[in-house]
């Protein structure tokens, strides 16, 4: 019997449905993982070292390819839209961002310079990067231009 992916429940921001992750086309590291993040909700992934917490988050933000990993089954939706086939920068553009453990900024740079380091490998033109930077300031007005 064929299994179909469940539809995003009303009010869910993220729906992960029965995903499978494989590294190097051989090593199965996740199988049958599902979770829902309701709008306004908080969800915690708990487990021992090596249980797949970070891999699940990397699957959601589509950062697995950098480590030769891929989602081979299931689906990942953000606001009822499939995002598992999008590039990482498109996932970010839609509002899903993974913040890694620890501090990943350069202390000698300003906030704006740190933000611009993330644009270093983008193929976008300066105007698009400037628009994205303005959007960040709109999301986080407490940063303000005084701190740049």
Model regions: which residues?
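The feature captures the beta-strand-to-loop junction immediately N-terminal to the Walker
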Residues: 46-48
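Conserved ABC ATPase "signature" region
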Residues: 75, 80-81, 127-145
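Short, conserved post-Walker A segment of ABC-type ATPase nucleotide-binding domains
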Residues: 43, 54-67
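ABC ATPase NBD Q-loop/coupling interface
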Residues: 63-64, 75-93, 121-125
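Short beta-strand immediately N-terminal to the Walker A/P-loop
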Residues: 43-44, 98
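Short coil-to-helix segment of the ABC ATPase nucleotide-binding domain corresponding to the Q-loop/switch region
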Residues: 57, 108-117
